[in-house]
């Protein structure tokens, strides 16, 4: 599972689409929101949304960063002309939010809503279930008043209908249940509305943050609608990261790549999101964090061709610049449940063969550790490859802990028993 943030605009559109249905008609949200971008101006938005010129407006950037009000990046109770000027003055400009600098490019526009009560609700996925947070004193100071937040826990395979919500009044209780069911059915991993208000059973989310499980895209894309997973604020993808991102979006498998240090000596080709964390953390724990070149994973039984393209991208990056100390490639993973190890290894082997000379020139040492369906065949292919390439390849099965193979790779080791 990869948790990925979505724009407030898209999250509010999802809420507007499903709140009435999931609350059995008790609540609704009209979803009056517009997204202004460099390609879609406020004038164009006003043509498609008549309310923009008929009501006071709220405007704020919609680029996956918070505390916009505290950074002076929220315009309230504005006329159309004021909103237009405010956006014009900020579009394409660099701002600093905390320690991060980035360019403003997307602005959320919605009706300004005068209100008396502000509520807070958040739902997040944890290892053993989902946790719900609620307070009837929401707003920008929620963190300073955290002792007033009520918490409820829904275990895995549990139902929110079985949870004791008697601490909430009946109206709020029904809303919490409806929102939680949307959260589960549409594969949210995090959803925070702070604040929201309720006016005559219309729920008005004034500020919303959401993340989705992107591996659910193929069965939820129709429910999600025309959403996107934006680049985190201030983050610019390299050409290679963009390529893997596009490849990931076209497949039912999961392919992720983040370049940490293109001149690093330690490179990872890891199967599985959980395993990728273990391998990367172990590299750092052993004192090689500054040498870690990349972070990422392939999982969900990718095809041989997809694995080849992924591996080729990593190997190409690794062999662009030589290091007199040589380089280390760890091809790892846990014990797969359904990914065909031999099939994915064939894709990696194809890429390694293609870069045979560059691997030698860069003095690359390769360490392999894998288990799962057809892993013995996959490991056999890897052993044979080492002889063919003239590149040292140490091959290990699931009998060797993941952390141990990293230690061997970074501090030297052989697999003479195999």
Q: What are the language-model segments listed below?
A:
Residues 362-370:
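Short internal beta-strands
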Residues 323-337:
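Short, glycine-/small-residue-enriched flexible loop/hinge segments at domain edges that mediate gating
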Residues 338-343:
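Glycine/threonine-rich flexible loop motifs
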Residues 2-192, 197-327, 353-357, 371, ...:
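ATP-dependent carboxylate/acyl-activation modules
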Residues 344-350:
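Charged helix-capping and loop-helix junction motifs
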């Amino acid at each position: 599972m990869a948790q990925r943030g979505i724009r407030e605009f898209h999250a509010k559109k999802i809420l507007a689409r499903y709140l009435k249905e999931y609350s059995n008609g008790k609540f609704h949200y009209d979803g009056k929101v517009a997204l202004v971008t460099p390609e879609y101006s406020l004038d164009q938005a006003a043509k498609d949304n008549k309310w923009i010129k008929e009501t006071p407006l709220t405007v704020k950037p919609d680029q996956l960063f918070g505390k916009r009000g505290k950074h002076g990046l929220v315009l309230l109770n504005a006329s159309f002309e004021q909103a237009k000027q405010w956006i014009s003055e900020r579009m394409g400009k660099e701002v600093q939010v905390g320690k991060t600098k980035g360019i403003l490019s997307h602005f959320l526009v919605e009706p300004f809503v005068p209100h008396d009560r502000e509520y807070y609700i958040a739902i997040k996925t944890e290892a053993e279930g989902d946790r719900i947070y609620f307070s009837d004193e929401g707003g920008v100071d929620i963190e300073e008043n955290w002792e007033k937040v009520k918490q409820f826990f829904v275990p895995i395979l549990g139902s929110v209908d079985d949870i004791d919500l008697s601490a909430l009044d009946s109206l709020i209780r029904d809303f919490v249940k409806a929102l939680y069911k949307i959260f589960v059915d549409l594969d949210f991993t995090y959803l925070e509305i702070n604040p929201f208000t309720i006016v005559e059973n219309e729920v008005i989310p004034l500020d919303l943050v959401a993340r989705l499980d992107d591996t659910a895209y193929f069965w939820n894309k129709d429910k999600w609608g025309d959403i996107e997973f934006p680049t985190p604020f201030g983050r610019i993808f390299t050409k290679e990261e963009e390529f893997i991102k596009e490849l990931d979006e076209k497949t039912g498998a999961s392919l992720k790549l983040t370049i940490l240090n293109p001149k690093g000596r330690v490179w990872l080709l890891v199967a599985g999101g959980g395993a990728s964390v273990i391998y990367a953390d172990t590299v750092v724990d052993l004192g090689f964090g500054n040498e870690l070149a990349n972070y990422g994973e392939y999982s969900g039984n990718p095809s041989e061709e997809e694995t080849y393209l992924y591996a080729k991208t990593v190997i190409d990056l690794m062999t662009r610049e030589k290091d007199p100390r040589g380089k280390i490639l760890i091809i790892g993973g846990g014990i797969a449940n359904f990914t065909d190890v031999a099939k994915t290894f064939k894709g990696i082997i194809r890429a390694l063969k293609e870069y045979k000379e560059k691997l030698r020139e860069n003095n690359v040492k390769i360490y392999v550790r894998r288990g799962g369906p057809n892993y013995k065949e996959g490991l056999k292919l890897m052993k044979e490859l080492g002889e063919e390439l003239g590149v040292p390849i140490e091959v290990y099965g699931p009998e060797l802990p993941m952390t141990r193979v990293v230690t061997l790779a970074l501090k030297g080791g052989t697999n003479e028993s195999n």
